[in-house]
């Protein structure tokens, strides 16, 4: 069982769902009548995006990007790479980027600049988790679920080497799991 690799549970499934509902209400007010393009960052944001968008009670569209600065590492490489771009033209659209976690901030800073370059009407960020201690660029989310300490967290979409995404909570991975690789 994969739970044996988890040092402790930081945020329960119930806490995540309650926060998704709370953020959904705020986003409903923010985007009423704006038909936002909600952009999920693959693969990690998928569980949060699914729960969050079910709580947003206004017209919206969904699209996805696969953008990475990690690979299989535990520390950002610093180089942002688009693996899959949007299928939707963002010009004149209100963009809401949905992210699982903001750590270094490089990926989101890159995306905000990219969407502005592509002439989006507005660009805002909602993240399930924020790790301010990991930040290397000056970027802040407009909506944050939870602040987390500078520990290696997995679950609810967040992974280590493509595993642990299916855990229904946010947990701290035992250091011996990633230090042995």
Curated annotation (Swiss-Prot):
EC class name: transferase
Subcellular location, principal: cytoplasm
Transmembrane helix found in the keyword field: no
Binding site for GMP: 131, 152-153, 159
Keywords of the record: Cytoplasm, Glycosyltransferase, Magnesium, Metal-binding, Nucleotide-binding, Purine salvage, Transferase
Binding site for Mg(2+): 99-100
Compartment annotation: Cytoplasm
Cross-referenced InterPro entries: HGPRT (IPR050408), Hxn_phspho_trans (IPR005904), PRibTrfase_dom (IPR000836), PRTase-like (IPR029057)
This enzyme's EC code(s): 2.4.2.8
GO cellular component, one term: cytosol
Family matches, as PROSITE patterns: PUR_PYR_PR_TRANSFER
Role: Purine salvage pathway enzyme that catalyzes the transfer of the ribosyl-5-phosphate group from 5-phospho-alpha-D-ribose 1-diphosphate (PRPP) to the N9 position of the 6-oxopurines hypoxanthine and guanine to form the corresponding ribonucleotides IMP (inosine 5'-monophosphate) and GMP (guanosine 5'-monophosphate), with the release of PPi.
Record family assignment: Belongs to the purine/pyrimidine phosphoribosyltransferase family.
Full protein name: Hypoxanthine-guanine phosphoribosyltransferase
Origin species: Enterococcus faecalis (strain ATCC 700802 / V583)
Classification lineage: Bacteria, Bacillati, Bacillota, Bacilli, Lactobacillales
């Amino acid at each position: 069982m994969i739970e044996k690799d988890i040092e402790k549970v930081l945020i329960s499934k119930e806490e995540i769902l309650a926060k998704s509902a709370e953020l959904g209400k705020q986003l409903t007010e923010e985007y009423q009548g704006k038909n936002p393009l909600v952009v999920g960052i693959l693969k990690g944001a998928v569980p949060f995006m699914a729960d969050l968008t079910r709580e947003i009670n206004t017209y919206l569209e969904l699209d996805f990007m696969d953008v990475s600065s990690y690979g299989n590492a535990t520390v950002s490489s610093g180089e942002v790479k688009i693996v899959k771009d949007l299928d939707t033209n963002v010009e004149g659209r209100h963009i809401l980027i949905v992210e699982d976690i903001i750590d270094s901030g490089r990926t989101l800073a890159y995306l905000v600049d990219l969407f502005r370059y592509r002439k989006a009407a507005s660009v805002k960020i909602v993240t399930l988790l924020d790790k301010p201690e990991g930040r290397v660029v000056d970027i802040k989310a407009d909506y944050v679920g939870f602040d987390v300490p500078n520990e290696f967290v997995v679950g609810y979409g967040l992974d280590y080497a493509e595993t642990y995404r299916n855990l229904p909570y946010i947990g701290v991975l035992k250091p011996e799991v990633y230090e042995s690789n």
